[in-house]
């Protein structure tokens, strides 16, 4: 399982929810396994680029007109996790070419890892708009009885394998 997103994106497959049912918010904690392509760089070995790791996934189904607001909410949740740990971080809006084909918008939250000479992603938040809903036939019945596709969003919790080195490095004392 590379991420819980695939399973969470199918919860309402072939269903029609009402406006009152939305938003639906899910959190999932799963072990993840990935074969990381292009992960052979010397600065991304060890804990920072593991093939097996645990991850919390945030997932949300929402009304199309609430999609941007829900996206900002997920970004804020991820940023608050990083702020709570006192990290130096930045939030980066990915260019369209760097987003997966299914995502309309993605922000990466990156923390400073001085020994790696820069920032590394610890969370990613994306808005698929109606892409996943169309593929899964997940719709919402509006108050006027019309039916349209809902929007889906997801975000990863902190990548613990990258948080640990940053915790050590950003909290070192001279003694």
How should these model regions be labeled?
Residues 1-175:
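TRNA-recognition modules of translation machinery and tRNA-sensing kinases, especially anticodon-binding
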